[in-house]
UniProtKB/Swiss-Prot annotation:
It comes from Bacillus anthracis. This is 5-methylthioadenosine/S-adenosylhomocysteine deaminase. Zn(2+) binds at H65, H67, H216, D304. Pfam families: Amidohydro_1. Its EC number is 3.5.4.28, 3.5.4.31. The keyword DNA damage does not apply. Catalyzes the deamination of 5-methylthioadenosine and S-adenosyl-L-homocysteine into 5-methylthioinosine and S-inosyl-L-homocysteine, respectively. Is also able to deaminate adenosine. Keywords: Hydrolase, Metal-binding, Zinc. Binds 1 zinc ion per subunit. It comes from the Bacteria.
Length: 435
């Protein structure tokens, strides 16, 4: 099946960050086979021609760190620091989860993400009360591209920890798929919730299965102080000593890093999922993304969960990410719009090991989203496309979402998930949680 999308303004995110006015994209099945300017007059015979009527077309956004199973916890535990928030609000509520509630919560998060322009994401879920196969089936049904990882903790007895490692290894062997729509990573929660032995076992599983690693790291000053007091090393050095960085690793946050750590992480291909809104809301601080990029680190933007954000809008994350860097460095050139867009598209895709997506180029997967600026005053005049995408647009502006060549959202309607049912069930299950 060959489909041509014509009469579009195409934000390619190629090496030149080229914007093509009055362009077209030809998709064959799941791949882009042509991106060009002007009237459609290709040598390719196509089955369908769709007039985009001047819409902006850009790569699908890539959320490098989230927790969609937590979506029912939106608005719970506001105005709290990370540790008490986790210990007194989030973990007690997660302990009440059932398989049915977890699926309902996941569906809500998926619906919000895909309708706001996210096409790919990397996720960590707490396995308590969760049917992991049902979660993976739900993500698959959404049509989204994802790395969904089972989180490991050292809670309970040594026997509990041993069982958690065994279950996580089975999960990795079952779901790791380097080139498929769904894959996974090895995901120890953090150095403050995992024993040394568990972290070493996670490193072993990642090496033996050639997977990536996903971990929360250097998120707060308290974490750095506590780990240094307990192990005599800062979190980066401690986790490295456990062997985790033998495989490409995504660290969520990286708020509290020094220059030596940034250089070390870049050398060891450790990437950062930058969660600006979550870090601000939890009072964790502001990650120095400018310094990370200057050190050669790969960085991708992320939302974290709705419980600490409180939405999954990647446009909002792009905007706050660039504004924060300009503010903390008192440098208006810090993190310009092209860089912010890169960190939410092709740069983010590289961070989570999905190089097949993130830009609109021949050979890439057909993952793209559209915005119609013609009826949106906040996107007018419509000629400064890149600026408007970062500083003015929001997830509510999305018209269409195509993932792997399939129309997942069309004219604002999600074709893969039942929006009315999902919203009804979310409210019903939320009422059942004992707060």
């Amino acid at each position: 099946m060959k489909t041509t999308y014509v009469n579009a303004t195409i934000v390619t995110m190629n090496e030149q960050n080229e914007v093509i006015e009055n362009g077209y994209i030809i998709v064959e099945n799941d791949k882009i086979i042509d991106v060009n300017s002007g009237e459609f007059a290709s040598d390719f015979e196509v089955d369908e021609v769709i007039d985009m009527k001047g819409k902006w077309v850009l790569p699908g956004l890539v959320n490098t760190h989230t927790h969609v199973v937590m979506s029912l916890l939106r608005g719970i535990g506001d105005d709290m620091l990370l540790q008490p928030w986790l210990e007194t609000r989030i973990w007690p509520l997660e302990s009440q989860f059932t398989p049915e509630l977890a699926v309902a919560s996941t569906e809500l998060g998926l619906l919000e993400m895909v309708k706001s322009g996210t096409t790919s994401f990397s996720d960590m879920f707490n396995p308590i009360g969760v049917d992991q196969d049902a979660i993976m089936e739900t993500v698959s049904r959404s049509g989204m591209r994802a790395a969904v990882s089972r989180t490991l903790f050292s809670f309970g007895t040594q026997e509990d920890e041993k069982k958690a490692i065994e279950e996580a290894e089975k999960y990795v062997k079952r779901y790791y798929n380097e080139s498929g729509m769904l894959t996974t990573m090895v995901a120890p929660h953090s150095p403050y919730t995992c024993s040394t032995e568990l972290l070493e076992e996670c490193a072993r599983i990642a090496v033996e299965n050639q997977t990536m690693v996903h971990i929360h790291l250097s998120e707060t000053e308290r974490e750095v102080r506590d780990i240094e007091a307990q192990y005599g090393k800062r979190p980066v050095e401690y986790v490295a000593s456990c062997g985790l960085f033998k495989r490409p690793t995504v660290i969520a946050h990286g708020v509290v890093l020094n220059d030596n750590e940034r250089a070390f992480l870049a050398e060891h291909d450790v990437r950062v999922a930058h969660n600006p809104n979550s870090n601000l809301k939890l009072g964790s601080g502001i990650a120095n993304v400018k310094a990370m990029l200057e050190a050669g680190m790969k960085v991708g933007i992320a939302t974290d969960s709705v419980a600490s954000n409180n939405n999954l809008d990647m446009f909002e994350e792009m905007r706050i990410a660039t504004l924060l860097q300009k503010g903390i460095h008192q440098d208006a050139t810090a993190l310009p719009v092209e860089t912010a867009l890169t960190l939410a598209t092709k740069g983010a895709a590289e961070v989570i090991g999905m190089k097949q997506t993130g830009s609109l180029e021949v050979g890439k997967c057909a993952d793209f989203i559209t915005i119609d600026p013609s009826n949106k005053p906040h996107l007018q005049p419509a000629d400064e496309v890149l600026s408007h995408l970062v500083y003015a647009a929001s997830g509510k502006d999305i018209s269409d979402v195509i993932i792997n060549g399939k129309r997942v959202v069309w004219n604002g309607e999600c074709k893969t998930l039942d929006e009315e049912r999902i919203i009804f069930e979310a409210s019903r299950y939320k009422r059942g949680l004992q707060r």
